[in-house]
């Protein structure tokens, strides 16, 4: 029977979409106020929209573009789908966001935020993991070294004003272990660490936190291996750019190398380097040890004292200052020695040396926050290039946070991800612009608005 009622018609082409929408709905019953229904029809959503100010900062100073200029692209231009610059940006910003594995590219290549960060048209997928892996195996040793030099250029450009105002550059030198678990080239067993590993060499600038150099070395390399050639490459640029600026260097006893002392003295660098105890040093401090032992027996309180003396080893061409710290407690006597050409009281020299603990914090952030130990390629050069990418990601964030409000200038990467980078947003493209609808309940909106001005060139 015809009732005269005619319901709304559904276009045939929409029936399949409607059925899929109904089938893909998820129901949750724990909420006592209403039924919860969820589906995957929200459109282009990202959880990393907070990286946009960092990308604007990068664009303003030409950082990724400058790095890409040092990397040759051997591919035929007519067959290139993903330019080298886009691959570089994709890989670097994934590292910054906490997606350190190349395999993560397969999950993120459709993410609208990363498409914007890589300057890729929205909706056009980014490169896959195999493409990134082939690209990582492309650079030569010369290109990697030149790219590291490009990072030094960026340091001079972005931090030069601070260096000239402070009139001091403080270099913290250290090495770190990078455990390996596969068949990586030049990965060897290191008895000191009791593991198969690489042994990277790192040089930080203390006042700015910048990583001026990171060199990958074979697993059996000593702590001080290649330190003088690496310092020479850095210092030639620093001395040329910052004449009259005092340069200081700190390192632990693994760098107690006479050639390094001579190098620093030749270039006028003030060095403070740990040096192992020996029979001569113990004999020169024997009276101090006995005096501290007597004080401890009288007071039963831990005792500490400092002294210094001049010493010339057989292989040294001159006398050098040795600073000693002696401690006596219930566990006995503890002796520490430094070799230095710095003036000042012995206690002040040791206090200056002990502040190099900040370098350990930087290394921890570099390895754990930026996952710089993910060097799982087979070829040594590919892993050296990966270390370069992680170094650049670290420095990009570090240069960025030097311009942040004072409360965040010392924040580590995990804090920056929580308070700035990890913001949920819906991305919508119109004929005129791309609109990013950030989460309305984001608790750091005012901070984000301030930070967003860092890359504003209007």
Task: Describe these PLM feature segments.
Residues 1-222, 228-241, 424-458:
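Dynamic "connector" segments at or just before major functional cores
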Residues 261-270:
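Short, surface-exposed basic-aromatic patches at helix termini and helix-loop junctions that form
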Residues 57, 346-389, 393-400:
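Short amphipathic alpha-helical "interface-anchor" segments enriched in bulky aromatics
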Residues 4, 24-40, 270-371, 452-458:
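An anionic, glycine-rich sequence signature occurring as long contiguous blocks
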Residues 182, 257-262, 282-286:
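A short acidic (Asp/Glu
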Residues 378, 383-386, 390, 397-458:
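C-terminal, non-catalytic "cap/extension" segments appended to globular domains
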